[in-house]
């Protein structure tokens, strides 16, 4: 009799990706941060009603906040709770990580941008944030050329 393996290595289920961030920024470091959410926000995220393409991270009073992350409230949301779709949401990071981010952003001109949002262990929403600098126009053109060349290479290899 074969037993099912209950301890599978569960892949994190991606909720949203910020493709624009990977095109606009070159990331030096990436961090995983928890997200402080209300009940209606979790329900909306489970329904897939989230957009992080315009969002960014701000540091204020030693804490990190995710701004302009648009979570559309469901129609069946509670009537006694005011649903603000773009409210700033607190990111849950260690003090050491917050201090490192603050130092690099203030001194060296780095930006903190969310890269993706995913489920961890089925119930926790995590945000992958990247610490990086903006790309110049020629860097973006190089990325486009490289991507086109990779597609062309794959096409040629497939036909052989």
UniProtKB/Swiss-Prot annotation:
Source superkingdom: Bacteria
Any one Gene Ontology BP term: trans-translation
UniProt entry keywords in alphabetical sequence: Cytoplasm, RNA-binding
Coiled coil: none
Pfam families: SmpB
CDD domains documented for this protein: SmpB
InterPro entries on file: SmpB, SsrA-bd_prot, SsrA-bd_prot_CS
Localization annotation: Cytoplasm
GO molecular function: RNA binding
Family annotation (Gene3D superfamilies): 2.40.280.10
Gene Ontology CC: cytosol
Cited function: Required for rescue of stalled ribosomes mediated by trans-translation. Binds to transfer-messenger RNA (tmRNA), required for stable association of tmRNA with ribosomes. tmRNA and SmpB together mimic tRNA shape, replacing the anticodon stem-loop with SmpB. tmRNA is encoded by the ssrA gene; the 2 termini fold to resemble tRNA(Ala) and it encodes a 'tag peptide', a short internal open reading frame. During trans-translation Ala-aminoacylated tmRNA acts like a tRNA, entering the A-site of stalled ribosomes, displacing the stalled mRNA.
Family: Belongs to the SmpB family.
Protein name as catalogued: SsrA-binding protein
Organism: Shewanella amazonensis (strain ATCC BAA-1098 / SB2B)
